[in-house]
């Protein structure tokens, strides 16, 4: 597909609720690269009680943000195991010092930025309700429960996570914007930022797919499958 044989070093960025998880999952289904989520990595290290995991947990328990140097150590340590693969970083870098530290270790080829209007994200996130015992997620717009506020299988009440309440969502989006604006500007100046704008993941995805076809080999068993 005209994809270069050189390994791809990519980053995906997008606000909470931008569809970043869905797009990342589709990318790894269709293309030969490893997806590295800093959130998953953090949880794994905390569960295993590694040195970095214990350090990170101490900050989280105090309600503090994990410092840049701890996140950087975590990500770079894991990337050492992926030197033979193309990879897609998700959730790192989040700040300018993290981006600069990553640059000292690897040359980033492309940064995929999902640009979804905040109003759309707000509607998307505040429409989410969960059944706490099972973790089942409902979306009032896309997959509502049969009875408002009630889990389909157990008949138990659904709750809205604190994170999904409108006032919290607005704060999270503002915090994301403030934190990542310098990172996006940094990558823009380097000429590696590719922004994909839209309101629906299914409409953004074909453009991301077409873009990556020029960058990285497709998975052979998926090569004939339409995205």
UniProtKB/Swiss-Prot annotation:
PANTHER family: NUCLEOTIDE KINASE
Superkingdom as given in the UniProt entry: Eukaryota
Tissue-specificity statement: Highly expressed in heart, skeletal muscle and liver, moderately expressed in pancreas and kidney, and weakly expressed in placenta, brain and lung.
Lineage: Eukaryota, Metazoa, Chordata, Craniata, Vertebrata
Positions with a binding annotation for GTP: 17, 19-22, 128, 138-139, 161, 172, 201
CDD domains per record: ADK (cd01428)
Regulation of catalytic or functional activity: Inhibited by ATP.
Enzyme class: transferase
Modified residues (Phosphoserine): 37
GO cellular component: cytoplasm; mitochondrial matrix; mitochondrion
Entry protein name: GTP:AMP phosphotransferase AK3, mitochondrial
Function statement: Mitochondrial adenylate kinase with a specific GTP:AMP phosphotransferase activity. Could also use ITP as phosphate donor. Its physiological function is to recycle GTP into GDP which is necessary for the TCA cycle in the mitochondrial matrix.
